[in-house]
């Protein structure tokens, strides 16, 4: 059964409005991720001051929860490139790759689990699994990529994994996950209301 022409027109306008809202919001969250790196950066472990905490994953995780894991991955890649040529330019392509692997694995896993179970348990479980997966990915990445780009012996990297690298990634991702879990529902209500307003 075909819809009346005027209804079809409204349906197209509604879809375009939702798409515009989605793209705009993802863009804003991606930009916010970059800004947060400029504003908040500090080392967690004195023995490894080059490993800095930043809250940049928070807006990207929000994008993944609100619009799906593909949106989170897209936001991750864009934010990583921008950060890699601005605030983190000293780390170059190495920093961009490591950022994409760390945040990308986190938001992909968390976003996929939350998409399958869109409630508080799904959000909590997705973030928890994402933290663990991201830490594992970064442990492997440090063993393979760090020696290639930084000229650090593999044995030296191995010695840093358990006391520094793995705890750092667990702590950083865990902090960001707790914040996302605390703020996502109020923010998601705003997303829903904004979309509903565009229907009227």
Per-region residue spans from a language model:
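Loop-helix junctions at membrane interfaces
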Residues: 1-200
């Amino acid at each position: 059964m075909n819809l009346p022409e005027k209804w079809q027109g409204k349906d197209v306008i509604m879809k375009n409005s939702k798409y515009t809202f989605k793209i705009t919001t993802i863009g804003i969250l991606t930009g916010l991720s970059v800004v947060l790196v400029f504003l908040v950066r500090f080392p967690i472990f004195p023995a490894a001051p080059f490993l800095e905490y930043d809250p940049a994953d928070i807006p990207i995780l929000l994008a993944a929860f609100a619009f799906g894991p593909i949106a989170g991955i897209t936001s991750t890649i864009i934010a990583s490139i921008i950060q890699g040529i601005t605030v983190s330019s000293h780390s170059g392509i190495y920093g961009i790759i490591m950022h994409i692997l760390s945040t990308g694995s986190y938001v992909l896993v968390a976003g996929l689990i939350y998409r399958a179970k869109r409630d508080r348990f799904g959000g909590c479980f997705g973030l928890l699994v994402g933290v663990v997966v991201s830490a594992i990915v970064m442990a492997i990445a440090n063993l393979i990529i760090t020696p290639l780009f930084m000229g650090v012996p593999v044995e030296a990297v191995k010695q840093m994994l358990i006391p520094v690298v793995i705890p750092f990634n667990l702590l950083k991702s865990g902090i960001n996950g707790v914040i996302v879990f605390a703020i996502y529902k109020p923010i998601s209500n705003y997303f829903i209301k904004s979309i509903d307003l565009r229907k009227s």
